[in-house]
Amino acid sequence: SVLSSMGCGRVVVIDYCTGVTASLAMRPWREWLRTYRQQQRGTHYLSAPGSQDITAEVCIDQLALGVGEADAIRSQAQWLQLWGIDELVDEGRRWWEEKASAPDLRAMTGRSRVREAEALCDPAGLGAFTVLEWVAGP
C-alpha cells in the first residue's frame, strides 16, 4: 500500500464523501452521481458523452477496505480551521480595517480573504467536501 511504502508522511483525500455505500441506495442517484460542464451542473451522464465531467461520491467504507480506516475524517471547514484559516481571516480583516477608507492591494486582498473563507467553509457550497487523512510513520 502507499502508506507502507511512504515510511512517514500523510495522505490527504478531499472529495464528496458518504460514510456507508448502502446509504446511496436511499438517495436519488443524481445526488451522488453528478455531472459538471463549464463549472455548472451538467445533464444526464449519458446525454453528452465526452462533453462533461462525471463524478461520484467516495464511499468511506470502501476506502477503509482497501487502505484501512482513516486516521481523521473532517468536514472541509474543520480541516481548514485546523490548518489556520481563522487566523488568516482575522489577519485579512485587520488589513481591511486599517485601510478601508483608502484601500490598497493588501487591504483588498484581506477583504477578499474573508469572503473566500466563507465560501470555502460553507457546507452547502464550496465547503461541501470531506477531508480524510491517513498518517504513516511516527
Language model: regions and residue ranges:
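Long, Lys/Arg- and hydrophobic-enriched amphipathic alpha-helices
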Residues: 1-138
